[in-house]
């Protein structure tokens, strides 16, 4: 999954953002599971990228008023 930029996130509909957020959170969970199992991640910087992208999506959801949590 590609890391999203702010313009790409803003162009999405609220439903698309929700689906993308769910996919990103699942991917982050999988990366953390690899670390917890004692494995080495393929790309160590990926976890930070995922966290930042999730934060971007949530920030834009708040700005747009479509945040569900």
Swiss-Prot record:
Entry-linked InterPro entries: Ribosomal_uL29 (IPR001854), Ribosomal_uL29_CS (IPR018254), Ribosomal_uL29_sf (IPR036049)
Keywords tagged on the record: Ribonucleoprotein, Ribosomal protein
Single GO MF descriptor: structural constituent of ribosome
GO biological-process terms attached to the record: translation
Keyword Ribosomal protein: yes
Domain of life: Archaea
GO cellular component, one term: ribosome
Leader sequence segment: none
Gene3D superfamilies noted in UniProt: 1.10.287.310
Similarity comment: Belongs to the universal ribosomal protein uL29 family.
HAMAP family according to UniProt: Ribosomal_uL29 (MF_00374)
Listed name of the protein: Large ribosomal subunit protein uL29
Taxonomic source organism: Natronomonas pharaonis (strain ATCC 35678 / DSM 2160 / CIP 103997 / JCM 8858 / NBRC 14720 / NCIMB 2260 / Gabara)
């Amino acid at each position: 999954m590609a890391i999203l930029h702010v313009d790409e996130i803003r162009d999405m509909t609220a439903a698309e953002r929700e689906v993308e957020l769910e996919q990103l959170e699942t991917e982050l969970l999988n990366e953390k599971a690899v670390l917890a199992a004692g494995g080495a991640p393929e790309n160590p910087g990926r976890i930070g990228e995922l966290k930042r992208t999730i934060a971007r999506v949530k920030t834009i959801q708040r700005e747009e008023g479509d945040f569900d949590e």
